């Protein structure tokens, strides 16, 4: 819709025009993928949404954790072919998110067949200095409890992650007695890799609040 060429053919709008020139190549909507799974007898499955798309993904959303208004602003990531800029994609995504249609208009889909995964969201912050490159995950266990974990993406970033609980203790001491609550942080380890775990705090992200201020 936004002017990127079709993935396989390199032609304009052939996917949304239902491939008028024919051929065997096809990309599918979520609804079509679900029809294929049903026809194959596939039962349990979960859908994830790589953003901006599956090629140069920075974030993965899921039905349990969908994007909010203002989050989908990093859209110019197709480096393989020329493209057209037909409209303001951030504004279009904001409208799609507000209408609850992101699962329909996501640029890419990742389907996991089988029991649901604990992982509900992941973001890769790998455009930083190597000592600060991390992955943030939101997980939900079988009881529905959510937690947030931050993993180092490089050996150099391990010190940054290990420092997070210390920063938490200093912030807690600094703001003791005030109305500001500091998110609890614990250090853990998985397969020899440290991670910082935080409680999941529901609320509205800063990006959404700032977008509202800009609108005013």
Task: Give the residues covered by each predicted segment.
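Short hydrophobic/aromatic beta-strand or adjacent loop that forms the aromatic wall/cage
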Residues: 105-112, 131-136, 193-195
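Conserved catalytic loop of SAM-dependent methyltransferase domains
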Residues: 45-83
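Conserved structural core of kinase catalytic domains
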Residues: 182-216
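Short, glycine-/aromatic-enriched active-site segment of Class I SAM-dependent methyltransferases
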Residues: 3-24
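Conserved Class I S-adenosyl-L-methionine
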Residues: 77-112, 116
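ATP-binding glycine-rich loop module of kinase domains
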Residues: 122-173
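Short alpha-helix
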Residues: 23-49
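Alpha/beta-hydrolase-fold catalytic nucleophile elbow
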Residues: 2-3, 50
